[in-house]
Design a protein with these regions (language model features):
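A short, conserved, highly charged catalytic patch centered on acidic carboxylates
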Residues: 1-108, 116-180
């Protein structure tokens, strides 16, 4: 059983009736769960925006939660509402954001809906299902070889993130107009 599922069963018995939105997931689940893994509030930053530019087009992309260690963003967590199946593009978006947020890039891009988490090492591409504890994250940072991304790679990641973000915005606009 994954640690987060175990933790939810023990700490949020009414998960299915109480947790509905991305905000619920962030505030009622991920935040206390991160504390249980050893992170302190001073190491967490929320809704931080980065500007992504492709040619003359510009967009702003926000992270849900960033974990900051020694003044550097090392993990970016994207919260999804429960029961929203995690798609490949969600994972790609989290990793792209993690690569652009800091120099050198953040170690991990994470997508989590409480039921499932996918944690991607941004350097190796390796995926796991457990959000690392703080000691695990510190060890990983310690061991990582952290080459700085080349300009050409940064531009490529920017274009991926830009496309993903804007197609999502477009989709949202389409959905919103359907709801009317």
């Amino acid at each position: 059983e994954e640690m987060i599922k175990q933790w939810i069963m023990e700490n949020i018995p009414d998960f299915n009736t109480k947790i509905h939105t991305e905000e619920d997931m962030k505030i009622k689940v991920l935040l206390p769960y991160l504390r249980s893994l050893g992170y302190v509030d001073e190491e967490l930053r929320f809704e931080n925006g980065i500007d992504v530019q492709i040619g003359t087009k510009k967009t702003k992309v926000y992270s849900d939660i960033e974990v900051i260690i020694n003044g550097k963003v090392e993990m970016v967590i994207d919260a999804k509402r429960p029961r929203k199946a995690l798609a490949e593009k969600d994972l790609l978006q989290a990793v792209s954001y993690a690569k652009l947020i800091d120099t050198p890039q953040a170690m991990y891009g994470v997508v989590c809906n409480g039921i499932d988490c996918v944690v991607t090492d941004t350097y190796t591409g390796r995926r796991t299902v457990e959000i690392p504890t703080k000691p695990q994250l510190l060890r990983a940072i310690d061991k990582a070889k952290k080459p700085i991304m080349k300009e050409v790679d940064i531009r490529e990641v920017e274009s991926v993130l830009f496309t993903l973000h804007n197609s999502k915005e477009l989709y949202k606009v389409i959905q919103d107009s359907k709801d009317v």
